[in-house]
From Swiss-Prot:
Protein name, per record: Histidinol-phosphatase
SUPFAM superfamilies (alphabetical): PHP domain-like
Gene3D superfamilies per record: Metal-dependent hydrolases (3.20.20.140)
Top enzyme class: hydrolase
Segments traversing the membrane: none
EC number: 3.1.3.15
Keywords: Amino-acid biosynthesis, Histidine biosynthesis, Hydrolase
Catalysed reactions, as listed in the record: L-histidinol phosphate + H2O = L-histidinol + phosphate
Pathway(s) of this molecule: Amino-acid biosynthesis; L-histidine biosynthesis; L-histidine from 5-phospho-alpha-D-ribose 1-diphosphate: step 8/9
Gene name linked to the record: hisK
Organism per entry: Bacillus subtilis (strain 168)
Matches recorded under InterPro entries: Histidinol_P_phosphatase_HisJ, PHP_dom, Pol/histidinol_Pase-like
Length: 268
């Protein structure tokens, strides 16, 4: 099995570090990785307003061509040493499918490997970023009516992302399937049979659509998350279905490339 980190951010991330692309590549080589994918947060749909206070959830549209160009140069520089893939972490946002598809139709030809994630959930009056901070998550619980309702909306959104028609360049990998648990130590919740059923529907849809799962270790670095962003029972179900699992550090600084790769080897 190729040693690969399939979820890495870059200096183009407005809420990340200024570590250079080369620093990420060098860290990967130092840790014995053979392949990496840069998956910066794709620009959000033009008509969508980023609900975070600093509006820093994603790369600016104006930076996208330079991002692709710089990775292309790095690929040549590291040819024969490290396989580097150009990718994006694309947000699935309900009701913005047409804009997402247009974006993918435009930039998909330049991408090698991408992730489809859910960060934003719709409330009655707006969208909220579920992983921004604990205060926003508390607001989300209030807006949805209960913590179970937040989980239900999250997994319904994940399911919608999997079955959505987003064109031929739709990302093939589902990102951090339990990101909704980022603040679980502050807002404890054990999944009900209903929610577990929704997760199973998502896994069935991933299998049916020939998609992959992000084995995301960034939750181990989060104060309130409590672990890797996939529960053991989900992992077992995914393996039974032969869903490909791709290790992802979700590094936002070079030092986190390959973080807890041993957990991936042990469990996958």
């Amino acid at each position: 099995m190729q040693k690969r980190d399939g979820h890495i951010h870059t200096p183009f991330c407005p809420h990340g570090s200024n570590d250079t692309l080369r620093q990420y590549a060098e860290e990967a080589l130092k840790k014995g990785f053979e392949s990496i994918t840069f998956t910066e947060h794709a620009p959000l749909p033009p008509s969508f307003t980023d609900p975070t206070p600093l509006k820093d959830s994603a790369m600016a549209q104006a930076s996208l061509e330079r991002y692709i160009h710089e990775i292309s140069g790095l690929k040549k520089e590291y040819r024969g040493q490290l396989s580097i893939r150009t990718g994006l972490e694309v947000d699935y946002i309900a009701e913005f499918e047409d804009e997402i598809t247009l974006f993918l139709d435009t930039y998909g030809p330049y991408l090698d490997d991408s992730i489809l994630s859910v960060h934003f959930l719709r409330t009655d009056s707006s969208y909220l970023c579920l992983d921004y901070d604990e205060h926003t998550f508390k607001e989300l619980i209030s807006a949805c009516g209960s913590i179970e309702a937040v989980y239900e909306q999250y997994y319904r959104s994940i399911y919608s992302s999997i079955v959505a028609s987003l064109g031929v360049y739709k990302p093939k990998r589902v990102g951090h399937i339990t990101l909704v648990q980022k603040f679980i130590k502050l807002f404890p919740y054990s999944m009900s049979e209903h929610i577990r059923g929704l997760v199973s529907l998502c896994l069935n849809a991933i299998e049916e659509n020939g998609m992959e799962l992000d084995f995301n270790t960034s939750g181990l670095r989060k104060t309130y998350a409590g672990g890797i962003y996939i529960e053991d029972w989900m992992l077992n179900e995914a393996k039974q279905k032969k869903i490909p699992l791709v290790f992802g550090s979700d590094a936002h600084q070079a030092g986190d490339v390959g973080y807890a790769y041993e957990a991936f080897l042990e469990r996958c």
